[in-house]
Regions:
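Start-of-helix register in tetratricopeptide repeats
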Residues: 4-7, 48, 55, 90-93, ...
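Residue-level recognition of tetratricopeptide repeat
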Residues: 11-16, 55, 62, 99, ...
Length: 247
């Protein structure tokens, strides 16, 4: 029979438990492998089993184990995942493919996977952000990266809520990289609003940097003054204030 979503979730939970226990005693990994092999024999939806194997191997490698258990490598995770994709090329499988390739620093391959996901029905702020960061690592034109971040933020709740606000900070930095300082300021302002003004001295310092590049000198002065107020011991802020005053 085809496993229900709840059954698949329960199975993933069990295997995650094995991996957690395996950090202390590798014999638990043997039990996880045995369960996976059993699932492959009885499951009608074998792609789901291959996907879960790949997902666990990926998570295991991200934990940076001191000694890798048997063949639980990124390469093996990718091999299992592509068996799942061969059976049923679901976008969620392709997303994990992108994550594994990203972890292997195969950024071109990861970007190709993320682009497929972004053309699917599971496209989300997170998937567009993954594509943007990958393209950034490929040294693409900063404006191309911003286009992806625009799509990321367009898929966030509007106005952007605090849970999604970090994307605004990311785009602000990308706008600065693209020499679009005024747009960076707008992103910082939107972030400030999204988190109801709950920001620290570093925020004011970064927004001051954007204001300075945008030649908004009074705003730059106001922000660096606020940074100093919140953290008067940081000499960097006082040096920056002196620079702005010279303008």
């Amino acid at each position: 029979m085809i496993l229900s979503a709840s059954s698949r979730t329960a199975r993933t939970g069990i295997f995650n438990y094995y991996v957690t226990k395996g950090q202390e005693d590798q014999s638990w990994f043997d039990k996880a492998v045995a369960d996976f092999n059993k699932a492959l024999k009885v499951a009608q939806k074998k792609d789901d089993v291959y996907y879960n194997i790949a997902k666990l191997m990926h998570a295991y490698q991200l934990s940076k184990p001191e000694k890798t258990y048997k063949d639980w490598t990124y390469d093996t995770a990718l091999k299992n995942l592509r068996q799942a994709i061969a059976i049923d090329p679901l976008p969620v499988y392709t997303q994990l493919e992108g994550d594994i390739l990203f972890a292997q620093q195969d950024y071109a391959g990861a970007l190709a996977a993320y682009e497929k996901v972004n053309a699917s029905n599971i496209a989300s702020p997170a998937t567009f952000f993954s594509a943007a960061k990958t393209k950034e690592l490929l040294k693409a034109d900063p404006k191309e990266v911003i286009v992806l971040m625009d799509s990321c933020i367009a898929r966030c709740p509007q106005p952007v809520t605090s849970a999604f606000a970090p994307y605004l900070l990311e785009r602000a930095q990308m706008n600065l990289n693209a020499n679009q300082a005024r747009n960076a300021m707008l992103d910082y302002d939107a972030y400030f609003k999204a988190v109801n003004g709950q920001v620290n001295d570093m925020f004011y310092y970064y927004r001051e940097q954007a204001a300075l590049k945008a030649r908004q000198y009074q705003r730059a002065l106001d922000d660096i003054a606020k940074a100093i107020e919140l953290n008067p011991k940081d000499l960097t802020y006082k040096a920056e204030q002196a620079v702005v005053n010279l303008r």
